[in-house]
Amino acid sequence: MTDTTAASAEAAAPPQLGILTQYIKDLSFENPNAPASLSQQGKQPDITIQINVGATNLGGTDFEVMLAIEGKAMAEDKVLFALELAYAGVFRIENVPQDSLHPFVMIECPRLLFPFAREIVASATRNGGFPPLMLDPVDFVGLYRQNMARQAEQQQQSKPN
């Protein structure tokens, strides 16, 4: 097989994504006003959720991708609970063109991690004495585009005139 044949066979290979491991990096659940906060059952709390994605190249084709989830439930001016979860996985990604690698890592990998992180959040809130917090599905394509637009805007603002 010649070099050109090997190169074209490599280019034709389908993208491959392997999950090597996944894990909780950090988990915090605070219930600062318990047991009084647990008696708020009739009132609907104001719940805010923030989800961010980060990735680190571990060398070669291996990437650590982390979902950072922060949630807070408030009733009037009191915190019912505060939750922070950093859930990560190590992925081996092969045969993805370089120009598609960043969106692939930042969209497909978090999409695979999310159901596991969602279950951890639901269990933590349930174990904290509250109804399980079931996170809505996340549009990781939209989140990626939003983050890219924010980065472009920050770069524009930091350029000298």
UniProtKB/Swiss-Prot annotation:
UniProt keywords, alphabetically: Chaperone, Cytoplasm, Protein transport, Translocation, Transport
Cysteines joined through disulfide linkages: none
Cellular component GO terms, alphabetical: cytoplasm
Location(s), subcellular: Cytoplasm
One GO biological process term: protein tetramerization
InterPro entries from the UniProt entry: SecB (IPR003708), SecB-like_sf (IPR035958)
MF GO annotations: unfolded protein binding
Function, as annotated: One of the proteins required for the normal export of preproteins out of the cell cytoplasm. It is a molecular chaperone that binds to a subset of precursor proteins, maintaining them in a translocation-competent state. It also specifically binds to its receptor SecA.
Quaternary organization: Homotetramer, a dimer of dimers. One homotetramer interacts with 1 SecA dimer.
Family per similarity comment: Belongs to the SecB family.
PANTHER family (UniProt xref): PROTEIN-EXPORT PROTEIN SECB (PTHR36918:SF1), PTHR36918
Protein name: Protein-export protein SecB
Organism encoding this protein: Afipia carboxidovorans (strain ATCC 49405 / DSM 1227 / KCTC 32145 / OM5) (Oligotropha carboxidovorans)
The gene coding this protein: secB
